[in-house]
Amino acid sequence: MVLKTKENKKFDIYLKSSDFAVSKKASKLIKKLNKKHPKRKSLNSFEAKKYDIYFKEVCKAVTNGINNQLICNHINLKILPGEFVVILGKSGSGKTSLLSLISALDRPTSGDSFVCGTNTICCSDAKLTALRNKNVGYIFQQYGLLRDLDVDDNIKLALPLKKRFNNNLEELLERLELKEHRHKKVHKLSGGQQQRVAIARALIKEPKILFGDEPTGAVNIDISKKILQFFVEYNRDKGTTIVIVTHNEKIVELAKRVIKIHDGKIIVDYLNQNPKTIEQINWV
């Protein structure tokens, strides 16, 4: 979908100019779409505080300097504390763009977008960073570990210096079967062990929400099942909100809530009344 804006009309003039002028104008349009909005009172701020994520009519637009395109299209979404949510979509469906918004990695172009009670559309970059550091944990398909540091030090990197001694560390090492590897350099670990280190790093600060972007995409089925089992148990035991973004329809069967996205729109959103266990799912 293309948004027709005043900027688009003005841009026609620049198409007859030099390439430099076009590039300069395009840069300004991109900055305008991604800048923070002035503080404004939202009619939904009181209701939003009940949710970890509260989105109402949220849009995200990108530009090539000539046309603006919606990559997230009027998203309405409410996620309560403690939910286990799977967002399902094919490549190019907009699921990663949505993840960037609901995890406060990016600001929307319009709408009300509350993450842990904060309206992210009004936040400066510094405030978005503070919001993420306090409330959000991430697990990506690429682990982002420092290969020459050991397991302990990689995990502790997620903590402020004054909190490097953390009681949560021992529990995570135990639950993720990493205790015997804690002093090994991570480049000496298997792929599955490295993934578990990344999970521990995301959870060491005890975030309110854990986001996983294709968290099992780079490991085999056996390791995937162990990782997913950990998510299920952690959600049950700690009450941490977990949101997994994936193209794998098998993972949907574990979720308490399933959201499907296509062309930047939520097309399905339902509660799974009978989520399956790892053993009940046919992984073949």
Swiss-Prot record:
- Alphabetized Pfam families for the sequence: ABC_tran
- Transmembrane annotation, as ranges: none
Endpoints of the signal sequence: none
Q: Where does ATP bind?
A: 89-96
Domain ABC transporter, first and last residues per copy: 53-284
InterPro entries in the record: AAA+_ATPase, ABC_transporter-like_ATP-bd, ABC_transporter-like_CS, MacB-like_ATP-bd, P-loop_NTPase
Tell me the GO molecular function terms: ATP binding; ATP hydrolysis activity
Q: Which Gene3D superfamilies match?
A: P-loop containing nucleotide triphosphate hydrolases (3.40.50.300)
Alphabetical keyword list: ATP-binding, Nucleotide-binding, Transport
Q: Can you tell me which family this protein belongs to? A: Belongs to the ABC transporter superfamily.
PANTHER family from the UniProt entry: ABC TRANSPORTER ATP-BINDING PROTEIN MG467-RELATED (PTHR42798:SF2), LIPOPROTEIN-RELEASING SYSTEM ATP-BINDING PROTEIN LOLD (PTHR42798)
Protein name as annotated = Putative ABC transporter ATP-binding protein MG468.1
Q: Which organism is it from?
A: Mycoplasma genitalium (strain ATCC 33530 / DSM 19775 / NCTC 10195 / G37) (Mycoplasmoides genitalium)
